[in-house]
């Protein structure tokens, strides 16, 4: 499991390291490395090719998406190897206790990859970096990044993954959240962006490094860290529009800087502003059970977080996940309930029913027209047939009449034969 609950300070005792029972979390350093020192990011490309490269697998010809997938696969394999070794040690030595989870290599936070270089190969990105940075020995302000002598240019195989990803503009998403989690002053009841407790139980809610629940012994309060992809959606439309405009302007500036090469200008780090998580502020004593109202400091400089002191909850005006979901291709998109569609369901059903009725009427009218046309064609064919039969009968009748006329003419023209024989009168008789 990725997140942890710290029960070390419940009894009020000091930390084993001698730091005492302090409720204040020490702020992290200003430089946020991409990984721990023992991670894959500290390897150079040559070491990575010798370690993970196989026959037909060249990291220079991969695009940036495939490179990140290979790095994540190597991280998972290294994490499994490092978690199996402490487990075997704990089984062999039960009295030694459970090793702290801080020594294990957890899954790194998701990397934000700019869309302009997501489909480019590693060699193309390296050439772009060389053309934009110019000569390595002539660049100013780059001390400590490379151990290459000034007379020779650094090659891709000698560069570490961390330096390459930093110069290419690939940034971990949880760096911004860790910087937001730093605590200033004596505010012991605030929100901690990342818990540095060494032991405890784990509950995973997304990113392992950011989701932790810590119980402190002196302030009797619970500190809840939620993943950066979750948040409460409220009606801060003006702030959301302003933030979207700022993000669009930053993205356009980065696109222009990538498309227009500058020989003496270094590639800027692609860091998009992210909203802080939902935080629980200091509890306030309330005499009655009603709502106490908003505190004096409605906006506590938390990048759009509206604080309500009566309930002890700091609520984001907009969803933290929506600020970075539009600017990168690999960040998770939060699930936002679309409540506006519920009121239009009746109207949509009526419109859909009308459309179905119109379609049925059109189909029935087309069928009736087809039947009528077929009946008309059939009648026309019958009429043509009857006309032909009538013409044939009329021809036969005319021929018969002509034959009768001819016979009458022939009989009238026939000559008379011998004289008719008549009975003679006889004079002989008995009287």
Curated annotation (Swiss-Prot):
DNA-binding heterodimer. Interacts with CPK32 and the AFP proteins AFP1, AFP2 and AFP3. Interacts with FREE1 (via C-terminus). CDD domains: bZIP_plant_BZIP46. This is ABSCISIC ACID-INSENSITIVE 5-like protein 7. InterPro entries: bZIP, BZIP46-like, bZIP_sf. Residues 10-20 have a biased composition (Gly residues). The modification Phosphoserine is found at residues 39, 61, 110. The modification Phosphothreonine is found at residue 155. PANTHER family: ABSCISIC ACID-INSENSITIVE 5-LIKE PROTEIN 7 (PTHR22952:SF463), CAMP-RESPONSE ELEMENT BINDING PROTEIN-RELATED (PTHR22952). SUPFAM superfamilies: Leucine zipper domain. Functions as a transcriptional activator in the ABA-inducible expression of LTI65/RD29B (AC Q04980). Binds specifically to the ABA-responsive element (ABRE) of the LTI65/RD29B (AC Q04980) gene promoter. Binds to the promoter of FREE1 and activates its transcription. Residues 319-331 have a biased composition (Polar residues). It comes from Arabidopsis thaliana (Mouse-ear cress). Its main location: nucleus. GO terms for biological process: abscisic acid-activated signaling pathway; positive regulation of DNA-templated transcription. Residues 1-29, 133-153, 319-338 are annotated as: Disordered. Residues 351-414 form the bZIP domain. It comes from the Eukaryota.
């Amino acid at each position: 499991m990725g997140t942890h609950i710290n029960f070390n300070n419940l009894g009020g005792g000091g930390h084993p390291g001698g730091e005492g029972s302090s409720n204040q979390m020490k702020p992290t350093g200003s430089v946020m490395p991409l990984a721990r020192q023992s991670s894959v990011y500290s390897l150079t490309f040559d070491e990575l090719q010798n370690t993970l490269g196989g026959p037909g697998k060249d990291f220079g010809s991969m695009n940036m998406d495939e490179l990140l997938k290979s790095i994540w696969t190597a991280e998972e394999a290294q994490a499994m190897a490092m978690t199996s070794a402490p487990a075997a040690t704990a089984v062999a030595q039960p009295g030694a206790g459970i090793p702290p989870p801080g020594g294990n290599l957890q899954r790194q936070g998701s990397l934000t990859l700019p869309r302009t270089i997501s489909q480019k190969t590693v060699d193309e990105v390296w050439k772009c970096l060389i053309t934009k940075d110019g000569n390595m020995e002539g660049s100013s302000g780059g001390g400590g990044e490379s151990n290459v002598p000034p007379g020779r240019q650094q090659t891709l195989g000698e560069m570490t993954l961390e330096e390459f990803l930093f110069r290419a503009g690939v940034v971990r998403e949880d760096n911004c959240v860790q910087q937001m989690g730093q605590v200033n002053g004596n505010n012991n009841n605030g929100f901690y962006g990342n818990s540095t407790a060494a032991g405890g139980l784990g509950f995973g809610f997304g990113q392992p490094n950011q989701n932790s629940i810590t119980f402190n012994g002196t302030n009797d309060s619970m500190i809840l860290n939620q993943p950066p992809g979750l948040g409460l959606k409220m009606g801060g439309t003006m702030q959301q529009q302003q933030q979207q405009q700022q993000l669009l302007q930053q993205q356009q500036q980065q696109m222009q800087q990538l498309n227009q090469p500058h020989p003496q200008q270094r590639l800027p780090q692609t860091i998009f502003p992210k909203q802080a998580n939902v935080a629980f502020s200091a509890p306030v004593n309330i005499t009655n059970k009603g709502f106490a109202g908003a505190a004096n400091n409605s906006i506590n400089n938390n990048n759009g977080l509206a604080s309500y002191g009566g309930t002890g909850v700091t609520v984001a005006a907009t969803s933290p996940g929506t600020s970075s979901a539009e600017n990168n291709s690999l960040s998770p998109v939060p699930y936002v309930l679309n409540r506006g569609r519920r009121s239009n369901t009746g109207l949509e059903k009526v419109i859909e029913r009308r459309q179905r009725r119109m379609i049925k009427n059109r189909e029935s009218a087309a069928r009736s027209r087809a039947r009528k046309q077929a009946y008309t064609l059939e009648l026309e064919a019958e009429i043509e047939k009857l006309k032909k039969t009538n013409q044939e009968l009329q021809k036969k009748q005319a021929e018969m009449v002509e034959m009768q006329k001819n016979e009458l003419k022939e009989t009238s023209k026939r000559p008379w034969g011998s004289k008719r024989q008549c009975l003679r009168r006889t004079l002989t008789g008995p009287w």
